Amino acid sequence: EMSFPGFDAAVNAVQAGQADAIMAGMTKTKERENVFTMSDTYYDTKVVIATTKSHKISQYDQLKGKTVGVKNGTAAQRFLESIKDKYGFSIKTFDTGDLMNNSLSAGSIDAMMDDKPVIEYAINQGQDLHIEMDGEAVGSFAFGVKKGSKYEHLVTEFNQALAKMKQDGSLDKIIKKWTASSSSAVPTTTTLAGLKAIPVKAKYIIASDSSFAPFVFQNSSNQFTGIDMDLIKAIAKDQGFEIEITTPGFDAAISAVQAGQADGIIA
């Protein structure tokens, strides 16, 4: 079963015990591994500055005196915090990508930073966005559950199915469906392909973001879809368990797993 509260809310949902796991384009970091048991990675990402087409920015120096939007709790926020004093800009945080995009369109922020494939997807969908810079490599996405929870076995099950998908090409197929790239840069670090776990319970609550296309977003039929949704559904099918997806937002998803309100996070 799935819910889509947004990245911030998805994190909080896992921390609060309202979701079992989180999957929403969550970058694997040492800090997060202190709180979450995280899977092998499935996608390398970059974060990049985006503006409207009429206000292009090609270097960080041009951000002086401006306001840059970013989503709460993300790798992009951490990067901006590390350079804001050097380049003299301020940061405004948002719970969802939709709110951030709307603020950029309305002119209440001058630029925003998000994952490069997310911005590229939005541009291809006709949104008034533009990128001039190459972006900053900040890590790779992974699935996570609360460290020490009784559902840590979900990470083992995820890794087993992910290894199989890396070997048979089905992971690349999912990623290429939604982007122009592939997962080929992500190392296959597990040798568990072909194994199958015995689920501890019939259905797990997985927390995710709510608007993070092409990883998770609502389509024209009001159904949540994207890379993360295709991936977690394929893994659940391979491992023989059911999932309920919640989408509280990235930060809330992390909090939900940490609080035991969710079993895992893919965000």
PLM feature segments, named:
Residues 75-92, 126-133, 160-200:
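Ligand-binding clefts/hinges and TM-proximal coupling segments of bilobed small-molecule sensing domains
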Residues 6-10, 18, 22, 59, ...:
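Stable alpha-helical elements in mature extracytoplasmic
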Residues 1, 26-27, 44-97, 101, ...:
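Bilobed "Venus flytrap"/periplasmic-binding protein-like clamshell domains
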Residues 1-25, 93, 200-267:
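Extracytoplasmic small-molecule ligand-binding "clamshell" domains
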Residues 23-35, 78-84, 103-138, 251-255, ...:
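A ligand-binding cleft/hinge motif common to bilobed small-molecule-binding domains
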